[in-house]
Amino acid sequence: MVVHNGTAVTPRPAIGKVLLLAAASVGRGESIDFDNATVGAVPPGWMVAMTHTGGAPRWEVLKDDSAPSKPNVLAQVSTDRTAGRFPLAIWNRASLKDGTVTVKFKAVSGTVDQGAGLVWRYRDPNNYYIVRANALEGNVVLYKVQNGERVSLAPKGAVSNTYGVKHRVPKQTWSTLSVGFHGNLFTVSLDNQKLFDVEDSTFTGAGKTGLWTKSDSVIYFDDFQVVEQAGK
């Protein structure tokens, strides 16, 4: 399903591959590599949406020779330059309260922004958490989007107006972004290096997970993994 300005559109059917994961310490999860999905289509199980207005997002499966798991990736390819426009691809087949979400991403282009993000506890296009790595700004920031307003949340132990952390995010190179969310505590990692924690209690219930970009960011994603915390 595609949701744009309140209108739902059913994408072309596609065949995807979902690997089921199981581990006693973390619970059950899924890993999605898009390699059996139809090129040019939105993969099955994914819902396209957008926060704020602007040109419609364009999420589609592409072939990429550099993909961590070849041959396919999921890409947001629209280059609409509306600054406050946040394209979303939501994994529509699972909802969880506590767990970990991980994705590999490559910042391909964008003059306004080159932000690649993970979404969790998603309720609707105007209410969710998101952490994004920005290859133009060279930082990683965690936000809440509440009633359509995006607010940055300072790292634990930092002053209240601290804007994430400065960190090199390479362009045209694959990186791995991860967030663990357990109760009110969120832990952000980039390339297997812990960057910071955030505490917040705005959204405490279960919600969906997914992917996020901003404005004209063209971002490739691969190996999306979501693991639910055991016992939740």
Please identify what each model-predicted range represents:
Residues 26-52, 232:
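Extracellular carbohydrate-recognition regions
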Residues 31-33, 203-232:
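Ligand-recognition surfaces built from glycine- and aromatic
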Residues 39, 76-150:
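Secretory/extracellular carbohydrate-interaction modules
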Residues 41-75, 82-85:
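Extracellular glycan-recognition surfaces and repeat-rich motifs
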Residues 87-94, 163-169, 210:
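Beta-strand-rich interaction surfaces with strong enrichment in secreted/lumenal proteins
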Residues 148-176:
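Short, aromatic/His-centered strand-loop micro-motif at the edge of beta-sheets
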Residues 184, 189-208:
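Short, solvent-exposed beta-strand-to-loop segments that form ligand-recognition rims
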